[in-house]
Amino acid sequence: MELEAVLDQKMAYASLPEVVRNQFLWDSRSFVVAGTHGKTTTAALVAWLLTYAGRDPSLLMGGVAKNFGASHRLGRGREFVIEGDEYDSAFFDKTAKFLKYLPDVAVVGNLEFDHADIFDDLDAIRLEFRRLVRLIPGQGLLIVGADSDEAFALRDEAHCPVESFGLSSGADWKAVSITTGETGTKFLIERDGEPFVRITSPLLGDYNVRNVLAATAMVAAAGVDAKDIANGVATFEGVKRRLESLGELHGVTLYLSLIHI
């Protein structure tokens, strides 16, 4: 009924991505986290690492970041971290949300067929991601997942510097010496084949190792040093309903995970 009233009265209206861009992003340095999986956790971690380093970033994402107790925050710093979704912007605007977000630094961690309700096939999704990459300015940065052939191929579309991350041997940002225990994951991050920082992460699984790598590459581009990255990751509390530990029952640890972590 509200929508019909707006249309009947010819009132001005805009999609949420348009409002975010026009009200917040023109004067910000936009950090866009995109890909089929891992967006929410990575965006939350990027915002937390920047906060730990004293940057006071803004954040908009699709889950509740435990460190902030919310899915959004408006900081006083110039950095704006935003989860970049390829889903359409509104019923009247079928372009992908992330095309509105003015990316200065963008991560594309992986790329698979998704959102079958609006995309006919993988080619249609590829097109939106190619458009995103082409929006990054020449002085910006694209960070792609080396373990995803589809994401890695996007480097050829970029007109800006490109870095890669993953467990693959050729990744610019690579995790090695990975060990997993009951309390989390430990590993060494190498940058261009050289030791960069040792990580103790409360997060579990290879996907979360990749999320940490992506976040590390992003905040390193903002000038955050290795010590703050290590301490920030160690104090990261994760995202609600993303591989969230609910406790133990009869010796079995229970986790809640809503969707892509």
Walk through the language-model features, giving the residues of each:
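Acidic, Mg2+-coordinating active-site environments of NTP-dependent enzymes
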Residues: 1-16, 21-22, 26-28, 52-55, ...
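Walker A (P-loop) phosphate-binding motif
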Residues: 21-65
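Conserved adenylation A10 loop of the ANL superfamily
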Residues: 33-43, 109, 215, 260-261
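Short glycine/serine/threonine-rich phosphate/pyrophosphate-binding segments
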Residues: 39-45, 67-69, 89-91, 209-210
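Conserved catalytic network of the ASCE P-loop NTPase/AAA+ motor domain
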Residues: 72-75, 98-100, 134-137
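Conserved acidic residues
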Residues: 78-79, 104
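Switch II (G3) loop of P-loop NTPases
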Residues: 79-88, 254-256
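Switch II of P-loop NTPase G domains
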Residues: 88-102
